[in-house]
Regions:
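Active-site proximal beta-strand in glycosyltransferases
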Residues: 2-4, 100-116
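Short beta-strand scaffold positions
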Residues: 35, 86-87
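An amphipathic, basic-hydrophobic alpha-helix
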Residues: 56-84, 94-98, 102
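Structural signature of beta-strand start/N-cap positions in the alpha/beta core
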Residues: 2, 30, 50, 81-84, ...
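Short His-centered aromatic/hydrophobic patch
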Residues: 87-93, 112
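A general structural signal for well-ordered alpha-helical segments in protein cores
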Residues: 17, 41, 70, 93-94, ...
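N-terminal strand-loop element at the rim of the active site
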Residues: 5-65
Length: 116
């Protein structure tokens, strides 16, 4: 199974979701990590993960820019033949849900920290 983990910073993936990525990979899943460009992307790649820089601006409220991001993510899910997308943080969780629906046969999991 190919699983894509999507977060709003590479720092978040490295510090909070790295153990999940390792565990998924150890179970034989292909893992793709997606976040905006940052200093931890190289570290994730150095650990042997496929990391893709997303055109995401955490603070953007521009509807056109956000629509482009959802379209980009949907196309990425389709092109990569992703089976499951897991979105972390509110923006990534919502956008991953919409992109999974646009991509077709992609399962979706959303997680927003701090909700209990």
């Amino acid at each position: 199974m190919k699983i894509l983990l999507f977060a709003n910073t590479d720092w978040y993936l490295y510090n909070f979701r790295l153990s999940l990525a390792h565990s998924l990979r150890a179970r034989g899943h292909a893992v793709v990590l997606v976040s905006p460009d940052g200093p931890y992307g190289k570290r994730l790649r150095d650990l042997g993960f496929r990391w893709i820089a997303a055109p995401l601006d955490r603070r953007s409220l521009n509807l056109l820019r956000e629509a482009r991001l959802v379209h980009w993510l949907g196309r990425l899910l389709r092109d990569e033949k992703v089976d499951l997308v897991h979105g972390f943080t509110i923006k990534c969780a919502v956008y991953a849900a919409v992109a999974a629906r646009l991509a077709g046969n992609v399962a979706y999991v959303g997680a927003v920290g701090g909700l209990g």
